[in-house]
Amino acid sequence: KRLDDLGLGRTSVTIRGEADNPISPDPAVRAKGIENTKRAIDCAQAAGASALVGPFHSALGYFSGAGPTADEWKWGVESMRPVAEHAAQASVVLGLEAVNRFECYFVNTMADLTRFVRDVDHPNCRAMYDTFHTHIEEKNIPDAIRTVAPVLCHVHISENDRSTPGTGNVRWKENFDTLKEVGYDGWLMIEAFGLALPELVAATKIWRRMYQSEEQLARDGLAFMKSQYAQRW
């Protein structure tokens, strides 16, 4: 209610791990992944979030020692369909995320992600785009955005070192120009990591101070996004 009073929209994020991996060969583990993502959707709905985003198509940080198999792809699609239907009933859109090869082996590129979303084939299962991950995995940023554009619902604005957007070497002009070109008109969300949450420090491998304060990050990051938006939209 307080967020509503302030006029603030919100989104939410979730991940899966090895114990609830939606692409596990163990049906019980896959069922746990479905259950936990449905619970995350319920929490998002309770918080008034319009979207639940993240790489919850598979276990983050878990590696099989090989690339994705046909069975894993099938299990992933089958696991996501009931989750997407639950999201529809909750009026929550799912924004699946492709992450880099050092964090995930299942979905790394916008081509991978677009194929997965289309195979799930549910209107509440869509894709998100993250500038950090794409600058690791994609050869051509504009082409990557054009590939995912038909199923795109959410964008993470994230610097190459996870610090304040606009202070690193992400190709921001290419990103914003192409988002404008494809007609994107959804969320632009800062994703940055620092030292404030001890439980995230080890997970995100952040060992040094990335910005002066959370307030500085929010202020300067928002100003950067607004300046980019004002130049194009």
Where are these regions (language model features)?
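Hydrophobic residues in well-ordered beta-strands that form the structural core
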Residues: R10-S12, V53-G54, L96, Y129, ...
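Short phosphate-binding/catalytic loops that engage adenosine nucleotides
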Residues: L8, V92, Y184
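Histidine-acidic metal/acid-base catalytic patches
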Residues: D4, G48-S50, V107-Y129, T134-W233
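Active-site-proximal loop/turn and secondary-structure-junction residues that shape catalytic pockets
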Residues: R16-A19, F56-L60, A98-F102, T131-H133, ...
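Aromatic-lined substrate-binding rim segments of carbohydrate-active enzymes
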Residues: K1-G7, I15
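Active-site acidic/histidine proton-transfer and metal-coordination neighborhood
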Residues: D4-D5, P22-R126, E138, R208, ...
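Short active-site-adjacent helix-start/loop capping segments
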Residues: T11, A19-I23, P198
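Generic beta-strand hydrophobic packing signal
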Residues: T11-I15, V155
